[in-house]
Amino acid sequence: RAKEYILAPGVLDFTPASAQSVPDSYVADAVTEYIGQLGNITAGSIDDQYKLFANSMSPQLQAKFLSEASDFKSKVKAENISELLTISEKEIKATGDGYYQVTVLAKRDTYVNNEYLGRVDEAIEMVLQLVPPKSGRRWFLQINSLTRQNAETFKSKRNYS
């Protein structure tokens, strides 16, 4: 079957596309947004942030995440906690068939009632899967697994294996 390319007037080039792949920049932008939804929270925004984040997950992970996040969300609201997550390193590896292994090293600054409590280095790992477009979803990448841990623990596990 021949492929057809339609160029708009004045367009001199096209972006190659193939099944089960997207540009690296697309995956990187989605990861940045996902990390922001997970880590940049306040007492007033956590419900919306976590809802958006959960909408990008597989049904199984979504149920687990919302269940496990319930107590944390209550604590954030009760104690007026704010967290700011800043990405320091981001590694994305295409593993084939539309899957991506993502590792993010980040710094989490925590505040309670606007008082700074400190900074923690952490590692976030995700497996993303390219999925068909779905209403209510901005990205065509579904989060199939998610782990969040202290960066030192992550680095020692990585060096050990």
Predicted regions and their residues:
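Structured, amphipathic secondary-structure segments that form assembly/contact surfaces
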Residues: R1-K3, P9-S25, G39, G44-S161
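Solvent-exposed, amphipathic alpha-helical segments
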Residues: A30-I41
